[in-house]
Amino acid sequence: MLERSLKRIEDSTLGQDSEEDFGGLFSDIDLASPKLGKTADDKNTLVSNVLLALDDIDFGVEASQEIDILGDAYEYMISQFAAGAGKKAGEFYTPQEVSRILAEIVIIGHARLRNVYDPTCGSGSLLLRAASIGHANEIFGQEKNPTTYNLARMNMLLHGIKFSNFRIENGDTLEADAFGDTQFDAVVANPPFSAEWSAADKFNND
């Protein structure tokens, strides 16, 4: 039932301006994964408990407090997963402290950013921090890993970024730059230094 509900969310955007931002958003969610439990009952119990826990959260926070509970919870879960992922974590997550420093550096000389871009955006944490500190109206990013690409799009939506104000593309920035002709006020990046890469001759004059 939950899988059907998630599919309906994606399908509801077909033919709409938001179709590209929601298409395949939940494709990596595997409710049959053995990581959720050994039996179907175990899996159902775990998923039910998560939904009940979310239902207990008071989302009635006044707007003046500027607290994004869902977004903060999502960021926290990503950070906890990254903490146990070792070197691989650098491929999809930038610690908040590092994100803040990089964001503060790129906004020097700018009262307000028109847009911000990350060519290796991972889960989008660095992009969101730079956009927040720089008050950017538009967010652009590209991510090679399909699963991490979906994480980034979810991160944008859960932080209240309107689908019309962000564009995250799935693809290798070196092989197929989706924003080659676009001008940006600021560019931030924490490249996946632990990822394997072959320095092909075609990149020598890139």
Residue ranges and their predicted role:
Residues 1-106, 111, 164-173, 178:
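Non-catalytic, mostly N-terminal accessory regions of nucleic-acid modification and defense proteins
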Residues 88-189, 194-205:
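Conserved S-adenosyl-L-methionine
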